[in-house]
Amino acid sequence: MALLIGDGLWSGVIFTALFLLLVDLMHRRKFWRARYPPGPMPLPGLGNLLQVDFEHMPYSLYKFRQRYGDVFSLQMAWKPVVVINGLKAVREVLVNCGEDTADRPPVPIFNHVGFGHNSQGVAFARYGPQWREQRRFCVSTMRDFGVGKKSLEQWVTEEAGHLCDAFTQEAGHPFNPTTLLNKSVCNVISSLIYAHRFDYEDPFFNSLLKMLQESFGEDTGFIAEVLNAVPVLLRIPGLPGKAFPKLTAFMDSLYKMLIEHKTTWDPAQPPRGLTDAFLAEVEKAKGRPESSFNDENLRMVVADMFIAGMVTTSTTLSWALLLMILHPDVQSRVQQEIDDVIGQVRRPEMADQARMPYTNAVIHEVQRFGDIAPVNIPHMTSHDVEVQGFLIPKGTTLIPNLSSVLKDETVWEKPLHFHPEHFLDAQGRFVKHEAFMPFSAGRRACLGEPLARMELFLFFTCLLQRFSFSVPAGQPRPSDQGIFALPVTPTPYELCAVVR
């Protein structure tokens, strides 16, 4: 009897294994085309999951590119992926084929924090009516509240003043500037979303930022990729909360803020910020179940604005200060330009930027060298597309490798070095390269780019107007190698700030 049970068990195992192999074979059969991009041989069921180093993704993609070319394929379990490298191929995908490559692949790991059919936010929303509705709303609302205008510029300048005051308290001894940079940039976003700025010592504010900081990497590592590729695993009770504890806690805190803010909303009064404007649209959308204006989507939109608007800018500023202490000659030249154009008394203004080509070049080179979003947010083809002679089927996930563009050896003189002259012509005038795309390109380019540019210029010039930065005495020279997550952050470092 035991023998029969054993034989039956093994028969079941063998049958299941053969069935899964057959499913895997049939799933991949449609990609067996002569013009499908080449790539490493996938393992049955797993694909290339074990061949990609998710902790060092840019380098892993670089190695594959060296072997398979600018357009190559990967298989993440049963999910087909094509990686696009180099300026020519990336522009072809994002711009020339933009209408057919603007979709997003499903991201099952976000379902446990509120992502759903009518609550897709903006960044990860499927390309269609809901995305268009929310992007249009965010762009117009940001414009209404001063993006590109003097009113928001004053907010940023005032916050830069608070940041400089906080730096003054740290002057004279080594400190890591990252936390203070996070607080200042987050306050700009909070003012835009909630019409409220936090005191730097506010316990809730510090807890919120700590959770967000600790969530970096939770949605970009090997575990996240496996769960996205095999979403049935997310049905295991308690697994999502254990796999993404900090992201879950951050989203819960955002929801708490929204509930508290909603109790103070008066629809009869002009909107105080983006949240009030969204709530007004929710009222208008009642009776339209297909609308993306609902309470669930408000949380997703606010999360997108918070994460994209705060994390990217503060991380870039952290790179900027690191590179200033590593390149004191560049820092001195920026300060000389600040002294010549602005002086030491008045605060910097956006109008100054046109007369400060070197400072502008340095900020752009910080963005290029820092390369904080090397693999971009994945896209997905909504139709068959042809790229560089390869045929990519509908439903394929695309990874535009922005790092391969920002460090393209055919474009940049010194792609792996910090070199502000990349953005200056022979006469010292600022020039912008086609290969400069830290905000991506095409239909899904970052909608917060105008705000980010304003923040980077005003915060950076305010800091270098007030302080000189250096490597602390007795400490080794910090590394300029980043730590891969979303975003890529500098290796932790300390600096000394001396009031000028």
From Swiss-Prot:
InterPro entries: Cyt_P450 (IPR001128), Cyt_P450_CS (IPR017972), Cyt_P450_E_grp-I (IPR002401), Cyt_P450_E_grp-I_CYP2D-like (IPR008069), Cyt_P450_sf (IPR036396), Cytochrome_P450_fam2 (IPR050182). Expressed in liver, but not in kidney, small intestine, and brain. Gene3D superfamilies: Cytochrome P450. The keyword Oxidoreductase applies. Transmembrane segments: none annotated. Heme binds at C446. Its main location: endoplasmic reticulum. Its cofactor is heme. Keywords: Endoplasmic reticulum, Heme, Iron, Membrane, Metal-binding, Microsome, Monooxygenase, Oxidoreductase. It is a peripheral membrane protein. Its EC number is 1.14.14.-. It holds the Pfam family p450. GO terms for molecular function: heme binding; iron ion binding; oxidoreductase activity, acting on paired donors, with incorporation or reduction of molecular oxygen, reduced flavin or flavoprotein as one donor, and incorporation of one atom of oxygen. CDD domains: CYP2D. GO terms for biological process: arachidonate metabolic process; xenobiotic metabolic process. GO terms for cellular component: endoplasmic reticulum membrane. It is an enzyme of class 1 (oxidoreductase). Has bufuralol 1'-hydroxylase and debrisoquine 4-hydroxylase activities. Belongs to the cytochrome P450 family. This is Cytochrome P450 2D27. It comes from Mesocricetus auratus (Golden hamster).
